[in-house]
């Protein structure tokens, strides 16, 4: 944890060096350190991404950088290629609806909601998936599709 945190504290993280882009999500692989993912992802979004023509760091590389920020802003990120799962973080939005193709996903859309009342609510306090408590910060694609509704209660 200390070595990973050092990457951010010493300014060694470079989002334009694409192998680095999963780094903030690695904290969540360690129980009790998930808050670091939530804090760091938000800091990186605020620091490196803007709504200007040059608002994406580095080379877009066929959507890599914009995909990182879109997934991160929605609150989930596929941090391990080839593994159909996501690491969860605090969404920027109060509600996100993912419209799925009914040919492949007949149960309908996925909705991610938060109880955000303030921009200071950076941390996930508790979560439910399909109305049932979710105690992990990683979720399989199959479980997300099956649960359909991911709700996050946030805290400062």
Q: Where on the chain are the PLM-derived regions?
A:
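Active-site core of glycosidic bond-cleaving carbohydrate-active enzymes
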Residues: 1-111, 142, 148-149
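C-terminal beta-sandwich/jelly-roll accessory domains of carbohydrate-active enzymes
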Residues: 116-156
């Amino acid at each position: 944890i200390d070595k990973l945190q050092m990457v951010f504290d010493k300014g060694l993280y470079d989002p334009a060096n694409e192998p680095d882009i999963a780094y903030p999500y690695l904290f969540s692989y360690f129980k009790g350190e998930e808050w670091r993912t939530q804090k760091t992802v938000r800091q990186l979004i605020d620091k490196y991404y803007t709504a200007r023509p040059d608002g994406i760091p580095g080379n877009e590389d066929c959507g890599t950088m914009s995909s990182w920020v879109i997934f991160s802003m929605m609150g989930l990120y596929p941090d391990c290629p080839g593994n159909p799962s996501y690491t969860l973080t605090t969404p920027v939005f109060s509600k996100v609806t993912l419209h799925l193709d009914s040919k492949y996903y007949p149960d309908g859309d996925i909705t991610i909601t938060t109880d955000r009342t303030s921009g200071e609510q950076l941390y996930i306090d508790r979560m439910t998936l399909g109305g049932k408590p979710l105690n992990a910060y990683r979720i399989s694609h199959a479980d997300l599709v099956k649960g359909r509704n991911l709700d996050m209660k946030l805290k400062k």
